[in-house]
Amino acid sequence: MKTKTIVFIHGMYMNSLCWEHWVNLCQTKGYRCLAPDWPGRDKPIEVLRKNHPDQQLGHLTLGRVLEHFADTIKTLDEKPIIIGHSMGGLAVQLLLQRDLAVAGVAIDSAPPMGVFTTKWSFLKSNWPHITPFVSQNSPIEMTFERFQYTFVNSFPLAEQRAAYERYVVPESRRIPRNSLTARVGFKKSHPPLLLIAGSADNIIPASLIKSNYAKYKRTSSVTDFKEFAGRTHFIIGQKNWEEVAEYILAWLNEKGV
């Protein structure tokens, strides 16, 4: 029997609102969709911004986010499909190896330990939240100018501004630092996994996703890679996002899940 439940996992600097269009589309395809917020993020965007700097946010860790989603998944009546974006993509990789899902899709996945690049756009985009010169307990705001470069670099200005105002929230510095030591068991068998990259992504370059994908070559488990031309890091909210979503749904159907 095919799974009809999808759990969406958002990434850094956003909450579950970023999945609004995906949830609607997948529901029309007959899926039950859950898009939980990270701990403490189940508030309106304007409230999350107003609360900056939120000391509770400053102490949020990747481990806590993972357990939050693991606990949610364990309450379901069937193993779900999990789809994550950015740090949510890394969460998919980590949860999949715990056998908590029937399949996973990691979109623009943040790199786990052992996957790195010296590409300038990656270093420039990630330095503000991993710099050792600022306390890890200090939450960070995403400025509009930084959002333009890291998430929506090819969007028209009006669309950049609209996306920033609708979706962007402050973030914990601990989470990206935790990802540097997040261990993915690349040799371990796992349910089907699809890694997706955007060719115009500055913060998580497509070459980095390819390196992530290549690490799985020593396992016989199904691991696939797809690069979408012209897509930025905010591929899930970019024009023609439906093309990406439909590709994923077709892939899931092909894999029998």
Q: Each predicted region: which residue ranges?
A:
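Gly/Ala-rich beta-loop-alpha elbow adjacent to hydrolase catalytic centers
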Residues: I83-G88, V92
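Flexible "cap/lid" loop of the alpha/beta hydrolase fold
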Residues: L100-V134, R174-A182
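Short beta-strand/loop motif that positions the catalytic acidic residue
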Residues: S189, L195-A197, D201
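Short alpha-helix in the alpha/beta-hydrolase fold that links the catalytic acid
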Residues: P205-K215
